[in-house]
Amino acid sequence: YKRCHIKGGHCFPKEKLICIPPSSDIGKMDCPWKRKCCKKRS
């Protein structure tokens, strides 16, 4: 998991990652707003 950066009011991932809702991956939020988390694209 890597940090995301806020842009345009949304959380966008760095490199080849995607941001998903916390509910999809509880406990692994790693964004500034703590509203979404980054997870590697499957």
UniProtKB/Swiss-Prot annotation:
What's one Pfam family here? Myotoxins
Q: Which UniProt keywords apply?
A: Antimicrobial, Disulfide bond, Ion channel impairing toxin, Myotoxin, Neurotoxin, Potassium channel impairing toxin, Secreted, Toxin, Voltage-gated potassium channel impairing toxin
Q: Enumerate the subcellular locations listed in this protein's record, separating them with semicolons.
A: Secreted
- Gene Ontology terms, cellular component aspect? extracellular region
GO biological-process terms attached to the record: envenomation resulting in occlusion of the pore of voltage-gated potassium channel in another organism; venom-mediated muscle damage in another organism; venom-mediated myocyte killing in another organism
Instruction: Quote the InterPro entries the UniProt record gives.
Output: Myo_ane_neurotoxin_sf, Myotoxin
Q: What is its main location?
A: secreted
Entry GO MF terms: potassium channel regulator activity; toxin activity
- Tell me which tissues or organs this protein is expressed in: Expressed by the venom gland.
Which cysteines pair up through disulfides? They are C4-C37, C11-C31, C19-C38
Homology family? Belongs to the crotamine-myotoxin family.
**What is annotated about its quaternary structure and interactions?**
Monomer.
What function does this protein fulfil? Cationic peptide that possesses multiple functions. It acts as a cell-penetrating peptide (CPP), and as a potent voltage-gated potassium channel (Kv) inhibitor. It exhibits antimicrobial activities, and hind limb paralysis. It also induces potent blockade of neuromuscular transmission in young chicken biventer cervicis preparation and potent myotoxic effect. In vivo, induces myonecrosis, upon intramuscular or subcutaneous injections into mice.
Protein name, as recorded: Crotamine-IV-2
